[in-house]
Amino acid sequence: MPTVLSRMAMQLKKTAWIIPVFMVSGCSLSPAIPVIGAYYPSWFFCAIASLILTLITRRVIQRANIKLAFVGIIYTALFALYAMLFWLAFF
């Protein structure tokens, strides 16, 4: 009668082939978007959209008259957050 560890080892052997599949799933063509005959990387568009959304957020915070400490860190973090969310949502 197999023990719990041997059952886990057998199950791991059955599913071990999945690990290399996930490791090479990123080895595809670079996502590029053609704009007027030139190809631009998709991260460029995520950065532009993130910059626009960060500026809108800044304007909303200014109009609400909210005072923030560490403004540079906060807006940099918002820029990075928005860029990653755009990348996750659209690419």
Swiss-Prot record:
Main location: membrane
Keyword flag Transmembrane: yes
Keyword check for Transmembrane: yes
InterPro entries, alphabetized: YtcA (IPR031381)
Membrane topology type: Lipid-anchor; Multi-pass membrane protein
Superkingdom: Bacteria
Protein name from the UniProt record: Uncharacterized protein YtcA
The organism of origin for this protein: Escherichia coli O157:H7
